[in-house]
């Protein structure tokens, strides 16, 4: 335990909280990146599926794993994508989502409900 004199000289250290989405930094709601690998992975224990994910290289940070939401996609290696924060609960290490309908990733085909989340324009 520190003495009063030590506390006067040094003070106590503030505990810094861990960032949930470190690749986005403080001021960026989204970042652009390039896909290095597009693949499927299986979720954690009670669930079963083939979830579509991509490794994305972000300049000035490194590589992160991002989830591709919706049914079907046109992503390949070297596709340019926009990522946002938001984890996938049953995929360990996946803390980002790729935004549909932005840059190289098309919106979901034949989507009628919740269109804004999947980058689909209003059909007339």
UniProtKB/Swiss-Prot annotation:
<dbReference type="InterPro" id="IPR012340">
    <property type="entry name" value="NA-bd_OB-fold"/>
</dbReference>
<dbReference type="Pfam" id="PF00164">
    <property type="entry name" value="Ribosom_S12_S23"/>
</dbReference>
<keyword id="KW-0694">RNA-binding</keyword>
<comment type="subunit">
    <text>Part of the 30S ribosomal subunit. Contacts proteins S8 and S17. May interact with IF1 in the 30S initiation complex.</text>
</comment>
<dbReference type="InterPro" id="IPR006032">
    <property type="entry name" value="Ribosomal_uS12"/>
</dbReference>
<keyword id="KW-0687">Ribonucleoprotein</keyword>
<keyword id="KW-0820">tRNA-binding</keyword>
<comment type="function">
    <text>With S4 and S5 plays an important role in translational accuracy.</text>
</comment>
<keyword id="KW-0689">Ribosomal protein</keyword>
<dbReference type="GO" id="GO:0015935">
    <property type="term" value="C:small ribosomal subunit"/>
</dbReference>
<dbReference type="GO" id="GO:0003735">
    <property type="term" value="F:structural constituent of ribosome"/>
</dbReference>
<keyword id="KW-0699">rRNA-binding</keyword>
<keyword id="KW-0488">Methylation</keyword>
<dbReference type="InterPro" id="IPR005679">
    <property type="entry name" value="Ribosomal_uS12_bac"/>
</dbReference>
<dbReference type="GO" id="GO:0006412">
    <property type="term" value="P:translation"/>
</dbReference>
<feature type="modified residue" description="3-methylthioaspartic acid">
    <location>
        <position position="90"/>
    </location>
</feature>
<dbReference type="GO" id="GO:0019843">
    <property type="term" value="F:rRNA binding"/>
</dbReference>
<comment type="similarity">
    <text>Belongs to the universal ribosomal protein uS12 family.</text>
</comment>
<protein>
    <recommendedName>
        <fullName>Small ribosomal subunit protein uS12</fullName>
    </recommendedName>
</protein>
<dbReference type="GO" id="GO:0000049">
    <property type="term" value="F:tRNA binding"/>
</dbReference>
<comment type="function">
    <text>Interacts with and stabilizes bases of the 16S rRNA that are involved in tRNA selection in the A site and with the mRNA backbone. Located at the interface of the 30S and 50S subunits, it traverses the body of the 30S subunit contacting proteins on the other side and probably holding the rRNA structure together. The combined cluster of proteins S8, S12 and S17 appears to hold together the shoulder and platform of the 30S subunit.</text>
</comment>
């Amino acid at each position: 335990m520190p003495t009063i004199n030590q506390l006067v000289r040094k003070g106590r250290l503030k505990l810094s909280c861990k960032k949930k989405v470190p690749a986005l930094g403080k001021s960026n709601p989204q970042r652009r990146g390039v896909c290095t690998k597009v693949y499927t992975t299986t979720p954690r224990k009670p669930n079963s599926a083939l979830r579509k994910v991509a490794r994305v290289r972000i300049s000035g940070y490194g590589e992160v794993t991002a989830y591709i939401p919706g049914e079907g996609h046109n992503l390949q290696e070297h596709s340019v994508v926009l990522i946002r924060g938001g984890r996938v609960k049953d995929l360990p290490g996946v803390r980002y989502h790729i935004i549909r309908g932005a840059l190289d990733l098309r919106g979901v085909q034949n989507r009628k409900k919740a269109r804004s989340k999947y980058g689909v324009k209003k059909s007339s």
